[in-house]
A protein has these predicted regions:
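Short, surface-exposed basic-aromatic patches at helix termini and helix-loop junctions that form
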Residues: 103-112, 130-131
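Short, conserved catalytic/metal-binding motifs centered on acidic residues
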Residues: 1-9, 39, 73, 91-96, ...
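Short, basic/hydrophobic alpha-helical segments
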Residues: 68-90
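A general structural motif
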Residues: 34, 49, 86-88, 110
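Acidic, metal-coordinating catalytic cores used for nucleic-acid/nucleotide bond scission
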Residues: 92-100, 119-121
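Active-site-proximal, Lys/Arg-enriched surface segment
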Residues: 1-46
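Glycine-rich phosphate-binding "P-loop"
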Residues: 53-75
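An anionic, glycine-rich sequence signature occurring as long contiguous blocks
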Residues: 115-210
Length: 220
């Protein structure tokens, strides 16, 4: 699995260059910063991550809009996707990535994806799920006398956006409940991989693995 994620490595209100990105602050000031898209090979159950080439997020020639993490991800796939295709990569990503243009870029690079999908930023998906009958799978474990129940729910054939050209993916969620039935964790995802009672737990675990990559970069 390959986990790309954006990271800043410089920020200033005074020092800047032509390669800086900018943002306005609430006090009217301008911040100048450098950022890049890092990518690492990760795997559930393994502490180690293997870093891959990075792609800088910086002004692009001829572009009217400021560069962003998603555009950097598309460039990374175009440059490096072919070199990792033999790994049959599954790309992991946060909510910024779970939109059709980037999923299409991943598929053009002969990859698959498992991407975080927040309901608040995906209106079409939320509307499609409303009232739908979801598949469900539960797993209960007892560790040191404490009961934990993990509830997985999923639905296949969900459109990523409105329109006839919409890609259809599978939506899944993972909810962890303690012994009193209180929710201690929840997240939802979209994937172009097949989801079933046999695979849903593994798919959800794969997406959570990308946090290793983020933590490794934060310690560098």
């Amino acid at each position: 699995m390959i986990a790309p994620d954006g990271t800043e490595h410089f920020c200033s209100r005074k020092i800047h260059c032509a390669r800086c990105s900018t943002r306005k602050r609430s006090d009217g000031g301008t911040e100048y910063f450098h950022a890049f898209l890092g990518a690492s090979i990760v795997a559930p159950g393994h502490k180690q991550v293997l870093p891959l080439p990075r792609e800088f997020i910086a002004p692009q020639d001829g572009a009217a809009k400021q560069d962003c993490e998603c555009n950097a991800a598309k460039r990374w796939l175009a440059k490096h996707g072919a070199s990792v295709v033999h790994l049959r990569p599954v790309y992991l990503g946060d909510d910024l990535f779970s939109h059709q243009p980037l999923v299409e870029a991943i598929q053009r690079a002969n990859g698959s994806c498992i991407l975080t999908c927040k309901p608040a930023s995906h209106k079409i998906i939320s509307e499609y799920l409303y009232g739908a009958t979801l598949e469900e799978h539960r797993e209960t474990t007892i560790t040191r006398g404490k009961r934990t129940t993990t509830v997985y729910r999923w639905l296949s054939g969900v459109p990523l956006r409105d329109g006839r050209d919409a890609l259809h993916v599978s939506w899944l969620s993972m909810e962890i409940l303690n012994g009193k039935g209180k929710r201690t964790y929840y997240n939802s995802f979209v994937t172009d991989l097949a989801v079933s009672a046999d695979t849903v737990a593994e798919l959800a675990a794969c997406d959570r693995t990308r946090w290793k990559s983020r933590m490794r970069r934060s310690m560098c």
